[in-house]
Amino acid sequence: MKKIIFIILTIAFAISNLKAQNSIAKNLDEVIVSANRAQTEGNITNVQIISLEEIENAPVQTIEDLLEYAINVDVRQRGGQGVQADISMRGGTFEQVLIMLNGIKLNDPQTGHHTMDLPVSLEQIERIEIITGGASRIFGNYAYTGAINIITKSEMANSVSISGGENAFKSGGINYHTSTGNLKHNISVNQKESDGYIEGMDYKIKNYYYQAKTNIDGINALFNAGYTIKEFGAFSFYTPKYPNQFEKTKTTFASLQLRKEGKITLDNKISWRKHNDEFILFRENPSWYHNFHETNVFSMDMNVIQKTKTGTNVIGMEIRTDNIISNVLGNDLESPIEIDTNNFYYKGASRTTTNLFIEKNINLNDLAISAGIMMNIDSEYGNEYFPGIDIAYNFSNNIKLFTSYNKSMRTPNYTELYYSSPTNQGNINLKSEHSTNQELGLKWNGNSHKTSFTYYKREGENMIDWVLINGDSIWRTQNISQLTTTGYELNSRIDINKMLNTNLSISTLNINYAVNESDTTSEGFQSAYVLDHLKSNLSFTASQNISKKIRIDWRASRQDREGGYIDFESGEDVEYLPFWLISTRLSCKVFNNSTIFLEINNLFDNEYVDFGNIPQPGRWMRAGVKITI
């Protein structure tokens, strides 16, 4: 391990020029990010950005696969290709990451398994901002280990894309942009489907997305609306005992953002998200053990931002109401609600959360400070306070030192509280999770590289997990009283030709390396999520320019996961084994407005699992064309 770190540091630092001003990356404080409620320029906290260039050229087809490009982001998939994925950060769980679309929160109160049911595809995305570390003082609930903000394009090129591949994979999409006066419209429709890489892993996904943007009398307005449908075979998704499962989800989403800039800036957001989940445990006999859930989330976020000589003052308030009706989750309803002629909702639950925010941002030459506190008022869990502070100091135009201290929290979701089945049992007495987060890091932009190193520590209390006690046959939710997680992250983006003063076809190399360690192990029980984090994650991505029109992009990654599982067929304990994955994409520009591509994932057909008893895809080849009109 020490040898790996030494090699990476040597490559990143030894050949670069400390005083050089012409960085290959953007200036340290150039990008507007989601790192504070004021949405001001600058990058005080540890924020990563996946750029448009990376999005367009990565050998991936989904947002979930793209997030693997961020350092210390763990993407555990069940069906692949965006069917269902759990996103976690820094050794946390998939319930502890906030997912946003243009700053609108989209986490699902039923279960985090559905949070990535997003109505957008890669074609609509401008960039992705990843805020690592606890961020409840900025975003409130769910931002326990970090937050991800997906930013869509203001103006999309009119285009048509078609692709196909192994396992009867088919995909098609249309993107259309037009303007009426100063009102800009983006409309996108796309669909993909496959028979699956094994029996029971078939899927069909449809996305519909609309965005309108305008400025009226100095007020910037952004309207988003989307609808997505997923139908998929859920082979062993939730239990290997009954592998032939099936699930169908529908997500409807709409939001309106109004922002008026000035010495006093008013920033307001209102949103609604509806999610329907239909789960069939026995696909061949859908009339038996058929679960229905419907969630509705209404949210309003208001901020007043005052500009000062040295920064900004911010006060804000968020009100969020979560509702669920179900035939499984919640308390008994006064009267059943009809779903169809044969099924009814018998249970339901709701809660309202109000968050009050105060934030102070100070910029004094090379010193930047962002401090604030969030008061969480929850109808079920009472009132709590979560303070935090982020500090950054620029030693030069190219070197920045940053540190932070933040308190974070997450309340249990409805599945953790109420779910009951032959193999799982929720717990209505669960407490909220809490954590204290500390980090220290350095960012260095040189002439031929952009490098960052971060050390972090998270002290967690009342961590929520699904646990199987040895000798028991039922997974149960419970709070783990104490769990401390520490780790470090290294990222270096290198311009090889500048570094070596050559003209090689491989122009850029990006290296990510992360290590996570927890002070608790699963002795005497199995942990479904909390203790099955990545121990280490190493990845290399490279861009190879064959000619002006032909480009090859490569990605190689190695994952080593903590914990293990019981193999269903043998009944034996199996440790998660480390594995390598290599993927590549060949793209060629033709006729000045079109691109054809060939993409291969898992090039060497390695066998691996993200979750026990759910095999992941082997080698998968796809090819396609995108025509810009």
Residue ranges, per PLM feature:
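Short, acidic, small-residue-rich periplasmic hinge/interaction motif at the N-terminus
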Residues: 21-56, 94, 450
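C-terminal beta-signal and adjacent terminal beta-strands/loops
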Residues: 461, 507, 558-566, 584-629
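Outer-membrane beta-barrel signature, preferentially recognizing the C-terminal barrel domain
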Residues: 238-262, 349, 400, 407-461, ...
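Gram-negative outer-membrane beta-barrel transporters
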Residues: 363-368, 457-459, 479-565
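Short strand-turn segments of transmembrane beta-barrel domains in outer membranes
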Residues: 147, 152-178, 188-201, 244
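Extracytoplasmic beta-strand/coil segments of soluble accessory domains associated
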Residues: 64, 68-104, 108
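Flexible loop and strand-edge segments within Gram-negative outer membrane beta-barrel domains
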Residues: 194-201, 205, 220-297
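Short acidic/polar hinge/loop motifs at secondary-structure boundaries
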Residues: 86, 105-132, 150-151
